[in-house]
From Swiss-Prot:
PANTHER family: ATP/GTP PHOSPHATASE, EXCINUCLEASE ATPASE SUBUNIT. One of its GO terms (molecular function) is ATP hydrolysis activity. Gene3D superfamilies: P-loop containing nucleotide triphosphate hydrolases. It comes from Bacillus thuringiensis. One of its GO terms (biological process) is defense response to virus. This is Septu protein PtuA. The gene is ptuA. The keyword S-adenosyl-L-methionine does not apply. It holds the Pfam family AAA_21. InterPro entries: AAA+_ATPase, ATPase_AAA_core, Bact_Antivir_Def_Nuclease, P-loop_NTPase. Component of antiviral defense system Septu type I, composed of PtuA and PtuB. Expression of Septu type I in B.subtilis (strain BEST7003) confers resistance to phages SBSphiC and SBSphiJ. May be an ATPase. The lineage of its organism: Bacteria, Bacillati, Bacillota, Bacilli, Bacillales.
Length: 396
């Protein structure tokens, strides 16, 4: 078990000074580009590396950067771990790194680059070997997906052989097959080709290799199926655990990556359903994910006029942002200055100016421009028509 309680960052990346508190379940970090969302995840991940290399950089305005986390384990006692960073070049080591890096086994990291292409398997290999060194490396660089296909086909073949898979392995494999269709019920696992070792997926357009799914679907598979595979490998020598019983830490950068808005909210429910006991710290740019999260699961960041990153105060409401529009979330939660296009703002400004000046020619010119822009059911259309009608012209 591993739960991050608190994070303090000073002088790392674009962050001058920041303190964050996390809950034991989902923590969804949102905010504008450059606010430091990825830096937060990188800083946490680096705390469970060996410190020999660093992908985080000190803030150029500081002589050194520092990071400290407070966390709890099975014994429910609070521990602290910290590092100091003075270097600025790529892959320089941390100047000082203290704490229990052996906890890296409990940390699973997903970077923003989550794609994969077709892999040809000429034969099946044994399960990928794990080691403390690999856990430390993965905490900084993120887990790999190249061995998922071998894992899945291995479990598929031996699931048909008595007493070859444990009960835990069978349940995890069933979860893996079910998850192909959990975002879209028109997609499901079909079979494995015996002559080529290919995973076949049934879709509404026919059967395809699983590597031929859309980028969004593959990004989801990378996370969900990568988690199942990784948890099995990491805890195999401990008797194995079901994915739903994993109580470690999961870091996911850009959880909404490549996902259609229809799937973004589903992804929140899915990951909480599959990992009810894990702590998940993820970043997002998606207002649809913000809508789907509970209010205590959100960490909204902003940047003030002094370029300092701060945590936005969110309303403590029972239903979170489930009743808010996307535009309201973008502006009031995620810090977007304007949700309308510059062309629209120019057109509506010109229309209002022409009304004030009672310039009929420009009024009608601006009106027709807005008429071509607005959504057919936009209620503003009716108001614009009423305003134009004051000048003796009826618009059908």
């Amino acid at each position: 078990m591993l739960v991050i309680k608190e994070l303090k960052i000073d002088g790392i990346g674009g962050i001058n000074s920041l303190k964050l508190n996390f809950n034991e379940g989902l923590n969804l970090i949102c905010g504008p580009n450059g606010v430091g969302k990825t830096t937060i995840l990188e800083s946490i991940g680096h705390m469970f590396s060996n410190g020999s290399r660093s992908k985080v950089k000190r803030n150029v305005k500081f002589d050194q950067g520092s990071c400290e986390i407070s966390y709890s384990t099975f014994l429910d006692t609070i521990h602290t771990q910290s590092c100091i960073l003075r270097n600025y070049e790529e892959n320089d080591s941390l100047d000082w790194h203290g704490g229990n890096a052996n906890l890296a086994k409990e940390v699973i990291v997903f970077k923003a680059q989550r794609s994969f292409t077709y892999t040809q398997l000429d034969s099946l290999r044994k399960d990928t070997e794990t080691s403390d060194g690999k856990f430390l490396d993965d905490s900084m660089n993120g887990i790999q997906f190249f061995d998922f296909k071998n894992w899945f086909i291995h479990r598929f073949l031996f699931s048909h052989v008595d007493n070859e898979l444990t009960t835990v392995q069978k349940e995890n494999f069933k979860l893996a097959t079910d998850c192909f269709g959990i975002l879209d019920n028109s997609i499901r696992f079909s079979s494995v080709k015996s002559d080529t070792f290919d995973i076949i997926i049934s879709t509404s357009n026919g059967e395809i290799y699983f590597e031929y799914l859309s980028s969004g679907f593959k990004s989801c598979i990378y996370i969900i199926h990568g988690l199942i595979k990784e948890i099995e490998y990491r805890f195999k020598n401990d008797g194995g655990i079901k994915v739903q019983d994993y109580e470690g830490l999961i870091l996911i950068d850009e959880l909404d990556l490549h996902l259609h808005p229809q799937w973004q909210a589903k992804m929140i429910y899915l990951i909480k359903h599959i990992l009810p006991k894990a702590q998940i710290i993820a970043t997002t740019h998606s207002p649809h994910m913000v809508q789907a999260a509970a209010i205590n699961e959100l960490i909204a960041l902003g940047i003030d006029e002094d370029a300092d990153v701060y945590v936005r105060q969110l309303p403590n409401v029972q239903y979170g942002f489930q009743g808010w529009t996307v535009e309201e979330i973008l502006e009031d939660v995620m810090g977007l200055d304007e949700t309308r296009s510059p062309m629209y703002i120019e057109a509506i400004t010109e229309f209002e100016k022409s009304l004030d000046e009672e310039n009929e020619e420009k009024i009608f010119e601006a009106y027709y421009k807005l008429d071509l822009m607005l959504h057919p059911s936009n209620p503003l259309r009716k108001l614009l028509k009423l305003q134009v009608a004051q000048f003796g012209r009826v618009i059908e």
